[in-house]
Amino acid sequence: KIRAKHEVAVLEMGISDFGEMHRLAAMAQPDIGVITNIGLCHLENLGTRDGILQAKTEMFDHLQIDGTVILNGDDDKLSTKKEVNGKPVIFYGVGADSAFDIKKDIYATDIENHGLEGMRAKIHTPQGDFDAQIPIPGEHNVYNALAGTAVGLQLGLSIREIAQGIASVQTIAGRTNLLHVKGMTVIDDCYNANPVSMKASIDVLAHTSGRRIAVLGDMGELGAEEKELHRNIGKAVAASGIDALFCAGTLAEEYAREAKANPECEVHYKKTREEMTEELLAYVKEGDTVLVKASHFMEFPKVVEALTKE
């Protein structure tokens, strides 16, 4: 769909194994390469975070000769990549100081969490500072705004244009999409899930009002550590102070076990999505905020459909 009239194409490189980034980046031959973090996705094939780093940085072999690399400088793995093809990497992060031996070129301070209304932060750049109004909830979206700022500057946008662009961002279905229906707020974040994004979404829910209900399903492709990684999410639920957890799936039982450590959190576990949804529909009421999140194969958009059906 890219035509001569288009000036810029932004492409997400979705990978789950070694060699896939080589194939995709060879097609794209990017002028700018961005890696936002080295999380815990696709461990089944990639083994460790070092494996994930290796697979994602295959991109560097296919950059244009004068290409630019932009990395999250607060990530312990990415911060080791200080130079690519003889050119310094552009680093971004939260706070001017770094826990690693790098200089952040673009960074955020004065971060304010306004719940579902989004985030605010002061973003500092070599071209000047600006106040960013980020209309999507979650502290992780401050990092996304920083990455966008870095790309915008490389493309020659002004600080004002970048600030306007951040303020006008809109969500899409399955990606922290807020739905207001039947007096409830549904946070539709069910396109996919991994341990890092799951914790970020739970944090978003924890900063909302009303009864806070997490509806979670299994996370896939996590390899030998899958049970422990699911238990860690259950611990995050318990620590978050949310009011209720509904979960379904084979591994989601680990969420339930750990979440019960907080007696203030009502825990409901069912083996199947259908059974869980039936119980959930009988439980929710006006004023509730409901987060829905799971890996794609769990088909949790059907849960969102059930919640929002008139």
Predicted regions and their residues:
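Switch II (G3) loop of P-loop NTPases
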Residues: E7-F18, V186-N192
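Short SAM/SAH-binding signature in class I
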Residues: V8, I32, A147, K285-A294
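Acidic, Mg2+-coordinating active-site environments of NTP-dependent enzymes
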Residues: V34-V186, G210, K235-A244, A252-E266
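Active-site beta-alpha connecting loops in nucleotide-dependent enzymes
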Residues: I172, C190, N194-P263, Y269
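ATP-dependent carboxylate/acyl-activation modules
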Residues: A173-R175, F297-V303
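Short acidic-hydrophobic, aromatic-tinged amphipathic segments that line or gate anion-handling sites
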Residues: V267-M276
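Short amphipathic alpha-helix with an adjacent loop that forms part of the alpha/beta core around
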Residues: T277-Y283
